[in-house]
Amino acid sequence: MLVRGGMRTVQLIGVPPRDQAPPDADAVVVALKSRTAPVRQAVDDSLAALKWLQAGGTRQYFFKYCSTFDSTEQGNIGPVADALVDALGCGFALACPAFPTNARTVYQGYLFAGGNLLNESGMEHHPLTPMTDANLVRVLSRQTEGAVGLVNFATVDRGAHAIRDAMTRLKEQGRRYAIVDAITDAHLLAIGEAAASHALITGGSGVAMGLPENFRRAGVLPVRDDPAALPRLEGACAVVAGSCSRTTLAQLGYARNHVPVFDLDPLETPDAAALTDAALAWSSDKIGSKPLVIAASASPEKVALLQSRLGRDQAGALVEDAVAGIAAGLVERGVRRLVVAGGETSGAVAGRLGVRSLRIGGEIDPGVPWTYASGSGPELMLALKSGNFGATDFFLKAFRVLEAEP
């Protein structure tokens, strides 16, 4: 969203060293594996990232989380937001995970995904953060001692001034957070305008679409010829998937009709090294310019069975370790264009590949860009896809988009 709005954007993996200078960019993203980390670790990492960004002269801070508000009763959205509000001394922050282009909307405080209430969208079966309540005021209230209010649709639909006034009233009433309704991109733009003076904004990536214009209006955003331009990198193509979302399962179903697909079976082989070896052996004569797909994705029933045998945390760690090892093996064998499906999977893969920074390019589908990845390993074209994002043909479309770029 920031790149689309004209901001050159670089994403850093993990908290940078204290003495590392910020990259030459209009927006810097510090990516943390904080969604399912222990609360204390998530808070500490987030505060360390904040401190580094403050040292670099950042003007505004954005705590980005999933558009499906992925979290548990313990957090980590509430505890991290609390820590950031306290550290910045701002006393208040809006919370808006809406991303209408990807069918994530908030109405009367209820989050909808794909036209269904969040708890009826498939997210109730998420293997790590099952979402069983669509009322975000309730969900966030369970994660924070701060009071949570609502800026409802009728207010949002009246525009930025009405939104700003409503948030001011909520803060004066002692609310620490405001869930903000949004069902259209126009609403997100208005929310962004209303939050121009806020030190902290929290939400999904969608609400960021309203922010670049604030900086442009303030005269601090330079004109860029093409903020999405990336270096061109040739090499073999591959997809690795760990997400078990309905969207990813549908994308895999489509891919099976067009490219080779290998399915990992951690129920039969609950050993990450063995799963990795089997997948890489299968791929040995298939790596090339045409995509191949290796997936650990499974139905909710299979996920539940694996978790019952191994435990939720161990089952998740097994899949992440296997998929990350497979990605590393594919890169060793010449893959330079890689798509990764799944949020936790993406973090595991980026860590295993030694990725330190991602220059953000143009979008394949809304919310999913190609990036140019660099770090301790080979440079890569890398697309990290949230499990619930992307059209059905995403795994093939991604490489068509790359070929079409000049």
Model regions and ranges:
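Short acidic, glycine/serine/threonine-rich loops at helix termini
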Residues: 1, 73-77, 104-112, 162-163, ...
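N-terminal basic/disordered segments at the start of proteins
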Residues: 1-24, 42-45, 98-101
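Cap/lid and interdomain-hinge subdomains that line or gate substrate/regulatory clefts
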Residues: 10, 26, 42, 50-188, ...
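A structural-propensity feature for long, helix-poor, extended segments
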Residues: 21-34, 287-289, 372-406
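Short glycine-rich or small-residue beta-strand-to-loop segments that form or flank ligand, phosphate
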Residues: 28-36, 59-70, 181, 238-239, ...
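Conserved, well-structured core segments that form the ligand-binding/active-site neighborhood
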Residues: 114-279
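C-terminal structural cap/anchor segments
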Residues: 283-341
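Conserved, well-ordered active-site substructure
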Residues: 335-336, 344-394
